[in-house]
Amino acid sequence: MIVDRQGRRFRNLRISLTSACNYACTYCVPNGKRLVAAQDELSAEAMARGVAYLIEAAGIDRLRITGGEPLVSPKLEAFMGAVGQMGLSDISLTTNGQLLARKLPLLVDAGLKRINVSLDTLDADAFRSIARGGDLATVLDGMDQARAAGIKIKVNMVPLRGQNLDQVMPLLDYCLERGYELRFIELMRMGHLAKDSNAFLQQFVSLQQLLSLIGEHHEYLQANAPVDATAVRYEVPGKGFFGVIANESVPFCRTCSRLRLSSTGWLHGCLSSSNRHYVGDLLDQPRHQALPALQGLLMKALGDKQEVAFSGGATIMKIIGG
């Protein structure tokens, strides 16, 4: 196991199955151009081998499948079939939900138990304005079908001043009624927002601002969460839970256990670091040759982690999967 001087280790792997996405969300790709799959994306077999090697080299035991949008990838079935046999303690997936109903049989057959659905509003007009793709009713129907199939659902919402702040309470109440756990995600200084402070501040909604708004409608109590959790979690007594991933207001860098692998074979140890480490060539090598070199790169990736607080990063989130 590789541990740094802060006592941090890699435990959670987020793997971007593809950079392609069927949305073009305003806070992710401001030019409105949908991202497509990179020409040099790894195969499903190479990605699965990467997971197996990282389990052994770093002690990874939790996997989240991201994108882009993972449900648009033709690699999904083969990849999930492979990683489902690796003994991981948890496998989850983040999706925009547009293809959820269509892909649900595949996900159920693969044994998936948890999904996070990115959904920023229940208003159809605001949905079209923010996502610039897809259909709201299709997403909601997919979520209902997934819940009926026994899959646990969390909803990710990015509150944006001037765009969807009026949707905080409708979406929270919607989730509480259906047993979904809503996660508010503070806007992050990533991609174009790392360079444009004015654009960031004009849209940013803080943890305290969110709690003040929610407190006008619901009583809530802070709930327990794992030490390396990204979200500050709250309980609405008798109704359910919500969380806030408050990377600006309450940085969690000191306990971060996340490692990211892009669809093109780059390891990212920290979203706030411009450093990345190419492992694509190692994934074509036999285990006994790949592991020593991989462990060296993991040491470097762990050294990239910030000690105190997130300071932003130039990478587009869609490329490395949030």
Residues of each region from the PLM?
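Canonical Radical SAM [4Fe-4S] cluster-binding loop centered on the CxxxCxxC motif
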Residues: 5-45, 58
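Glycine-centered loop/turn positions within well-structured domains
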Residues: 23, 124-125, 251, 277
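A short acidic, helix-capping loop that chelates divalent metal ions and anchors anionic groups
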Residues: 33-37, 123-130, 191-197, 278-279
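Radical SAM/AdoMet-radical enzyme domain recognition
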Residues: 44-65, 69-185
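Short flanking/linker segments adjacent to small metal-binding domains or redox-active Cys/His motifs
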Residues: 69, 302-322
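Histidine- and/or cysteine-centered catalytic micro-motif in compact active-site loops
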Residues: 158, 185-189, 245-247
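Accessory C-terminal segments flanking Radical SAM cores
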Residues: 191-310
